């Protein structure tokens, strides 16, 4: 565990510190690691964690969201930039090099030190680690190496613990303990209220986001800037960086995404840090509000991105609006947006609207230690700007929480500035709309399709000559960071006119925002950074705003190419609530309220929406929203936009469904009038936020599926795809009622409808022959079904029962009266039958004896001599078969069996259970098998009167008993003794084996009967 944490820490932090130095540090962190484990165990469940933090906020007694004035922020940024100037100047010259700056800001009362130590790993992969060190003010500010010493092992350990727990849920809070610092819980995940767009894999986060959708409108909005999609090789920062980044407003949009990072409570420093330039197309994760897209720090350098200390990437238009969600949040977010819009030429306005404990119940954020956001501003085309912006990026804003009076004063200042910003932004938006309309007309006339112009991340800081303003293609890639799978949106060109969502070559060492700026400079004027609130996107040309829940289409998408916005909606819960869409007043002003509200899409977790625009025909942009199960098609004016839905690797089944879905969606466009109704449904469905497999279907990294554009209707149309919800549900097992099945040792046993079905195998076997004579054939035909499944109804069984006949008295009686083998209606009949059978058998024997005496010679000629072994065999078989019937029949006719035992004729299966048959057989065949094999001479005389010699002769006459006969002579056994012999006597006294003894006893029994 330690070694893994070492590797993660060293790789993410960069090669600045060697692994050797980190090992002893990790050994020292064992105590911290244990504490972290305890903290995790205490906060295993998000709801509990949310309550815990809410109580913690209340304990802090922080009344209103305490906002820091822009002036204070700027001063802090200037001081930080001066401190970081020397390392930044060296690295800033290298666009790909990460800025290495450690901000030592000692907070006064909060005693919170936010030190971001940035280490230069390689020109290709740069990491900027943000660590939140909570320490006492008395402790001296940490320098870069110290910060790394504490943060690296701690973050690594926390990540390891998180992995060992195997929890998809991001750590609710991570305790980063300074040696002398008070333990403060940095809340990473719980505050998703502000970050409804945070794409946390855990459903709990989504639930929180749903709860906090009310606050989502207030949450800072990520300007519609294209975030670099993670290169396929890059893995999004997992563990702290993803989870904390979501919880942390730090979510800095990677690669020029105007990084508005909510400084919600920066979770273990690595929260949405985006690799400044090394990211290349560096993967971007959505920031907590889905605003800042965390560049899942796909470190091309091969460093493990898992460490929470992700590289903060300077965002070209990065506005880190730490909007404390409160009543003020809307105004603050608007102000921040305006600041961003105004900051097209100016560097990002760091509005630290850190809300401390806003009473808003939905917000569980503990901003007790108001963490100011550090805004990494992506360096734009020129290295000079890079130096300036990197300085700001490295800005470690130390905001000392003094007195609430000061906070109130700052709040008033912020509100005042926000109003100015809003006014300025509105003006800028109007200008942009006019410019975009002109550009659209020019482009349509030219009919030129820009080949994959990098949709610049509408950074306000990007300074592009307005002459290049013809094409403003903005792609907003909102990629929810799934810890499990890195988002890899390959720049796969899908359709010729449309722009592949990530056209930037991943290999370009230039920082992605810079690349975007360079491309923009060539063909496009980046519109002032239009902050798109979590749900709203402003499409200036058509005054149509799509409020894609988190899936924010890049504002000012009016490029003739159309919106190349791969919108990977973060949490579907961010559900596109119409109020949230309207919450972005500046962005949505242009849009009629109905359209703006109507165009809210509940983003789907897994799906990346790439909206591609053809140069001429206007096609509805259909955004798949599996969570809301709505496809929203937006028509950008005069621009063909095809929505290519890219899906992260999830299931091939979903892929299969996509082709069908792609064909269906464009045809379903419904007039915009439906939008209000549909929106309400969306809001209800969005809360459910269960992505439908059929809607999510695109193979990961697979070619974008361009839905056929329907050029006709310009107004946005909403297509209900909810009907496929039923199709996507797995078929449920159909259980037959009232039939229980058991699988026992491989046998499938079904219980019958009745407890004890009358028809059973023994009953069938015993009653088949007698019943065939007197019963209708239907009885036997229907019986087999009874034992099998109880299929035959009870009525039919009752009919059968009425047909049962007693074998003795011949009466018909219901089956309930027939006990045991179902042969006799009562015990009396059974006993009488046994007695009568035995009596008749004796009479038969007497008659047979007389007949034999009368025809001695004839019997001698006709009766074939039968060996004693055959007779014994018949006897044994009779016993065996009779034993089987006795067990099934019961005790009612056991006496009858004993009566038949002496002369059971061969295998009893022949007699079919009827004494009458036996009598008939013995009468018609006087020489029964028992009599065969015995010399008729011995039968003619009385055995009880035999002498020893006669007994000797009798035994000698039996087959194979010549030797045994001598033993009888020696024992002086005469006729009477012979009749008394049993097998035990023969075996014990004479040492005769069991086989011969049984045979002899069988013959003796025959003599007894005669």
Curated annotation (Swiss-Prot):
Domain SAM: start-end pairs: 946-1010
Record has Nucleus as a keyword: yes
Residue positions, PTM Phosphoserine: 651, 904
Induction (record text): By retinoic acid.
Chain positions covered by the region annotation Disordered: 1-25, 212-243, 259-312, 444-506, 565-588, 646-678, 772-794, 854-928
Zinc fingers classed as FCS-type: ranges: 797-831
Tissues showing expression: Highly expressed in testis with lower levels in most other tissues. Expressed in embryonic stem cells.
Binding, Zn(2+): 806, 809, 825, 829
Start-end of Gly residues biased regions: 279-292
Cross-link (Glycyl lysine isopeptide (Lys-Gly) (interchain with G-Cter in SUMO2)): 769
Ranges of biased composition (kind: Polar residues): 212-228
Residue ranges with Low complexity bias: 1-22, 464-480, 575-587
Biased composition (Pro residues): 453-463, 488-500
InterPro entries per the UniProt record, alphabetical: PcG_chromatin_remod_factors (IPR050548), SAM (IPR001660), SAM/pointed_sf (IPR013761), Znf_FCS (IPR012313), Znf_FCS_sf (IPR038603)
Annotated GO CC locations: nuclear body; nucleus; PRC1 complex; sex chromatin
Designated name of the protein: Polyhomeotic-like protein 1
Organism: Mus musculus (Mouse)
Record gene name: Phc1
